[in-house]
Amino acid sequence: MKIDKEQIIKAHQLHKNDVGSVQVQISILTDQIKKLTDHLLANKKDFISKRGLYTKVSKRKRLLKYLKERNIETYRDLIKNLNLRG
């Protein structure tokens, strides 16, 4: 099932015009990571996509660390909603 980027933004935005908050960025990155993971399972030798996956995972990790330092409750809610370990 393909989830649209706009649906992800609407699900995690803080206000009507919010498209760049940390929660939205993490949600979008999580969706992209899931798609890349599925792609790499089918295409094991696609090393460029693998590098892109590592980049996205590390960016999400940095954003999660930032959110955890700034607002632990929002961090916990986001981890729970996205089914991430934490």
From Swiss-Prot:
Q: Which UniProt keywords apply?
A: Ribonucleoprotein, Ribosomal protein, RNA-binding, rRNA-binding
Q: What is one Pfam family matched by this protein?
A: Ribosomal_S15
State any GO CC term.
Answer: cytosolic small ribosomal subunit
Residues annotated as coiled-coil are none
- Which one GO biological process term can you cite for this protein? translation
PROSITE patterns documented for this protein: RIBOSOMAL_S15
Q: Reply yes or no: does the keyword Ribosomal protein apply.
A: yes
Q: Which GO terms describe its molecular function?
A: rRNA binding; structural constituent of ribosome
RNA-binding found in the keyword field: yes
Q: Which family does it belong to?
A: Belongs to the universal ribosomal protein uS15 family.
Function statement = One of the primary rRNA binding proteins, it binds directly to 16S rRNA where it helps nucleate assembly of the platform of the 30S subunit by binding and bridging several RNA helices of the 16S rRNA. Forms an intersubunit bridge (bridge B4) with the 23S rRNA of the 50S subunit in the ribosome.
| Subunit structure as annotated in this protein's UniProt entry | Part of the 30S ribosomal subunit. Forms a bridge to the 50S subunit in the 70S ribosome, contacting the 23S rRNA.
What protein am I looking at? Small ribosomal subunit protein uS15
Read off the lineage from the record. Answer: Bacteria, Bacillati, Mycoplasmatota, Mycoplasmoidales, Mycoplasmoidaceae
